């Protein structure tokens, strides 16, 4: 398992809570600094700390520091 950081808006967070998960593709940053940079540049203020499998593929580009999960990510509690 690895800890990653998913950046989203408040509106998206509400959808995640309503549906109980994040629909694929689920993109996340490997470190908080990149997530904060993304948050500031896009205006998305929410950063979620998620656990991805250790073998989650790297996302092309993105400074080689982003991962993607091509399955639904179920949220336990927020």
Task: Show which residues each predicted segment covers.
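Conserved NAD+-utilizing ADP-ribose enzyme module
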Residues: 1-2, 10-13, 19-78
């Amino acid at each position: 398992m690895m800890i990653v950081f998913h950046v989203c808006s408040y509106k998206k967070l509400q959808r995640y809570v309503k549906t109980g998960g994040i629909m694929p593709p689920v993109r996340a940053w490997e470190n908080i600094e990149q997530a904060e940079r993304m948050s500031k540049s896009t205006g998305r203020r929410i950063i979620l700390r998620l656990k991805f499998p250790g073998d989650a593929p790297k996302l092309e580009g993105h400074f080689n520091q982003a991962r993607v999960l091509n399955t639904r990510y179920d949220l336990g509690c927020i």
